[in-house]
């Protein structure tokens, strides 16, 4: 019922973790692999291992979360070794998603060259929604720099590649970014990363709740679902059909998943809710989505995918 075709591969369902959640270590990744998730993605890696920002840097909130993690990860080679080994031992399984998030364009190019030269046959996600040069916006808010990077990437990269984007809030920005992305043989766009630089306050203590950046951090969870749905829809209606969409942001229930699929997402990533509930969330959310589809008389996701009605 939930069978999904994505990047020319077949998955039992559209659900996966969002990079950053439950995917830091091999143990985490193995738990995801053993769960009901249709697919899973590694922690966004940098060339070298990173400790990330000082604690506390992640706090669950009533309707979501705030974080300023600072890209903690065990380094590119740790994750590449894992995916290559896994690929060899489990050749019959669907492809693994491998996430990278270089601290500069040069670092992204270096990692993509290593992936290109390796035997990795899965899907790579390039995170364009993390810090760039100090004093400049994160890469995907710098349209010129994004276009320049992708031009360079596709001079050598021939494997399936998706990009993870921050949320946009201006219709003109959707137009500009879609025009850039449509130039390239991208496999997918992942919308959205957390909404940057929110602030959550503990009124009792009269203080912020996370330590880095004076308490400013990315907001996730139910708080961001309307923004995520808007971004999914905006890109679904603007991108060439060969570029598929992963919907991320505020997916906690079967209904949230249904709404993302209705807007045009093909795969769905869960972050905040997975952090709160653990991999058992996939069992629950699959049942809830199937129940909604049964109530509506839908046999498959294709029956309603992308078919959001306007008034």
UniProtKB/Swiss-Prot annotation:
Which biological process annotations from GO are given for this protein?
'de novo' pyrimidine nucleobase biosynthetic process; 'de novo' UMP biosynthetic process
**Residues spanning the signal sequence:** none
Q: Which cofactor does it need?
A: FMN
Question: Record's Gene Ontology CC terms?
Answer: cytoplasm
Cofactor annotation comment: Binds 1 FMN per subunit.
Q: Which pathway does it take part in? A: Pyrimidine metabolism; UMP biosynthesis via de novo pathway
| Outcome (variant: residue 43 to E) | 40-fold reduction of enzymatic activity with oxygen as electron acceptor; more than 120-fold reduction with DCIP as electron acceptor
Q: Which family does it belong to?
A: Belongs to the dihydroorotate dehydrogenase family. Type 1 subfamily.
* Subunit structure as annotated in this protein's UniProt entry: Homodimer.
Q: What is the name listed in the Swiss-Prot or TrEMBL entry for this protein?
A: Dihydroorotate dehydrogenase A (fumarate)
* Source organism per UniProt: Lactococcus lactis subsp. cremoris (strain MG1363)
Designated gene of the protein: pyrDA
């Amino acid at each position: 019922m939930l069978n999904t075709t994505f990047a020319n591969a077949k998955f039992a369902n559209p659900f996966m973790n969002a990079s950053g959640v439950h995917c830091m270590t091999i143990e985490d990744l193995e738990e995801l692999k053993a769960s009901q998730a249709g697919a899973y993605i590694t922690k966004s890696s940098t060339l070298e291992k990173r400790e990330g920002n000082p604690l506390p840097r992640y706090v669950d909130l009533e309707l979501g979360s705030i974080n300023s993690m600072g890209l903690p990860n065990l380094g590119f080679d740790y994750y590449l070794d894992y995916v290559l080994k896994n690929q060899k031992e489990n050749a019959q399984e669907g492809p693994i998603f491998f996430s990278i998030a270089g601290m500069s364009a040069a670092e992204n190019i270096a990692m993509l060259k290593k992936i290109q030269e390796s035997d990795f046959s899965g899907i790579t996600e390039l995170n364009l929604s993390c810090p760039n040069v100090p004093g400049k916006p994160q890469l995907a808010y710098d349209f010129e720099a994004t276009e320049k990077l992708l031009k360079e990437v596709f001079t050598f990269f021939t494997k399936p590649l998706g990009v993870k984007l921050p949320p946009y809030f201006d219709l003109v920005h959707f137009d500009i970014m879609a025009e850039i992305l449509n130039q390239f043989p991208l496999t997918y766009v992942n919308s959205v990363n957390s909404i940057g630089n929110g602030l959550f306050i503990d009124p009792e203590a009269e203080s912020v709740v996370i330590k880095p950046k004076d308490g400013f951090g990315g907001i996730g969870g139910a708080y961001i679902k309307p923004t995520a749905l808007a971004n999914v829809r905006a890109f679904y209606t603007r991108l060439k059909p060969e570029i598929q969409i992963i919907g991320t942001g505020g997916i906690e229930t079967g209904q949230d998943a249904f709404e993302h699929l209705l807007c045009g997402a093909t795969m769905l990533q869960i972050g905040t809710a997975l952090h709160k509930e653990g991999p058992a969330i996939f069992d629950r959310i699959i049942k809830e989505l199937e129940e909604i589809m049964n109530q509506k008389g839908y046999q498959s996701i294709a029956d309603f995918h992308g078919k959001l009605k306007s008034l």
